[in-house]
Amino acid sequence: MRLPRITKFALYRENPCLLPLYHATRDPSLAKREWTWICKELKLLYPEISKHGLRKKIVNACQLRARNYPLQYILKSQPFGNIKIDCQQGVLIPRWETEEWVERVVDKLNRLERLKPLKILDLCTGSGCISSFVLANLRVPHTIEAVDVSKKALKLAVKNCDRAIAHGTVGKINFHQIDVLNEHERVESLLQTSHVLLCNPPYISDDDFAAQTDISVRKYEPKLALLAKNGGNEFYYKFSQYIKRMLQRNAKDFVPLSLIVFEIGSTHQAKIVKSLFDDTNWQANIEQDGAHQDRVVIITRKDRRLIDI
């Protein structure tokens, strides 16, 4: 959408900083909203700075946005449910779609009556947004094992989860740097003692990355956290192999894994994941997000159901 020159002039006259924000948003009302967020959040980020110094940071932020630099990296945070997640370049920005399904799952887990801790595995934790929300909101005693291949992501996840623990009272967390596609023994060892697997893996194919993602995602967010081989399905195939092998190697009665939640990116992908787990041991259901797009596959053990789906 091309903004009429007279509208550009009106924006500039109202506030020169709105013009670079418009270049990022392509929407005058969104540009004004971002201006409000930037002013508010930077003032909170730098409470001791002078008015002149704050103004320089605000102008610099607007110039960065004109180059499609993500707002969350500028403001260094992103709301996620009732908590705030610190953000930095090199670590995937939490999405509202993830926030939605995590809230639903935690709400269902909170209905459980358990005395022994629930063991939760968060594979591909990234910023730690999923683990942080669980720590802050799950009232059932629990221990989380958070896994990622990226040192940078894990360092940020530790920071976010430490802050979340202050909100909650019954959770603990451990962190593991693991290449989940290749270190199968370490992953299977964690799976073997977990009741719940929560996973938002890389799931975008090379073709979809080039054709469907925003320029800000392509330019600035880590491809390591976004792209997957095999049409975007590499992680789902690998994890299903791990789980099936683990169940074959161990007596089912001694494997507590009862609930698996995978985020997915399309209906086609959801059907693939569902087909990997629709068997005698598991029941898989597809759920949509608030935009009515298929977003998660929720998989439960038929002989050991934790929650109803």
Swiss-Prot record:
Subcellular location: Mitochondrion
Catalyzed reactions: L-glutaminyl-[peptide chain release factor] + S-adenosyl-L-methionine = N(5)-methyl-L-glutaminyl-[peptide chain release factor] + S-adenosyl-L-homocysteine + H(+)
EC numbers, comma separated: 2.1.1.297
Amino acids binding S-adenosyl-L-methionine: C124, T125, G126, S127, G128, D148, N200
Gene3D superfamilies hit by this protein: Vaccinia Virus protein VP39
Molecular function per GO: protein-(glutamine-N5) methyltransferase activity; protein-glutamine N-methyltransferase activity
Top EC category: transferase
Keywords from the named record: Methyltransferase, Mitochondrion, S-adenosyl-L-methionine, Transferase
Sections of the chain in a coiled coil: none
Family membership: Belongs to the protein N5-glutamine methyltransferase family.
Function description: Methylates MRF1 on 'Gln-270' using S-adenosyl L-methionine as methyl donor.
Protein name: Probable MRF1 mitochondrial N(5)-glutamine methyltransferase mtq1
Source species of the chain: Schizosaccharomyces pombe (strain 972 / ATCC 24843)
Taxonomic lineage of the native organism: Eukaryota, Fungi, Dikarya, Ascomycota, Taphrinomycotina
